[in-house]
Amino acid sequence: SVERFVQSGETLASSDYQQFFGGKGLNQSIALARAGVQVLHAGSVGSDGHNLISTLADNGVDVSLVNEVDGASGHAVIQVDKTGENCIMLFGGANQRNQEQSISHALDQAQKGDILLLQNEINHLPLIIESASDRKIPIVFNPAPMSDAVLNYPLDKVDYLIFNQTEGEALASQRGTDNILHRLRQEHHRCKLVLTLGSEGVIYQHGEQKIRVDAVPT
C-alpha cells in the first residue's frame, strides 16, 4: 500500500506489504473448482512453484499437466494507493516458457464437453487457439494483460471473448461501450462477447442478442 503510485526516479515507502498466490489462471481454476466444476490446469511453474501447485491441488484442481521449468514462476508487483486504485507490473517467468510438445499433450486430454479457458499471460497463444479450434474445443479467452500482439491472434476462432472497457478500446480501436461492441461484432462475428464493467455489471452480446446484468453488491 502506498500514498500514491511511485514516479520515475523516485523511491517511495509503503505502509503495508502482503504476498498472495495468484495469477488469472490459478484464480480462475480455483474459483471454478470451488463452484463444482472439474478443472484440469495446464501450464508451467518455476523451481519456486511447489506451493502454487499445492494450492491448486488443495482446492480440488487436477495439476497433472503443470510442469516445472528452470527459473522463477510468474510474479506480479501491485501498488495500491490510498483510494484503492492499483498499478501492476508483471514478470512472465515460467508462464512464458510453455513448450509446444506440452501444449499438444494437454490439448489431447480434452474430452467432449470440455472448455478451454485462456488468458494473455502465457506464450504460444496463437498456436494454442489454432490447435484447440482444430480439435473442436470451445475456447474462452480473456486478453488481459492486453498487448498489441493480441490484435494478431486468430480471435475469429475464439468462442467467448471476455474483456473490460480498456481492453475493448484496444481491441476495437473505439471508445464507448456501444461502439466497442459494434466493431467487435463486425470483426469477430463468431465470438460471443462479454464486456465487464466493474461496478456497472456486465454486457453479453452475440449477434443481435444483447443482455445486461447488474453487478451484485458484495
Question: What label would you give each PLM region?
Answer:
Residues 60, 96-101, 140-146, 174:
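Short gly/ser/thr-rich secondary-structure transition/capping motifs
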Residues 1-7:
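Positively charged, low-complexity intrinsically disordered leader regions
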Residues 148, 174, 178-218:
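Conserved phosphate-binding/catalytic region of the ribokinase-like
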Residues 41, 66-68, 78-115:
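Conserved phosphate-binding/catalytic loop of the ribokinase/pfkB sugar-kinase fold
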Residues 132-141:
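Short beta-strand/loop segments at the ligand-binding rim of alpha/beta enzyme cores
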Residues 146-153:
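Short, glycine/polar-rich helix-capping loops at beta-to-alpha or helix-loop-helix junctions
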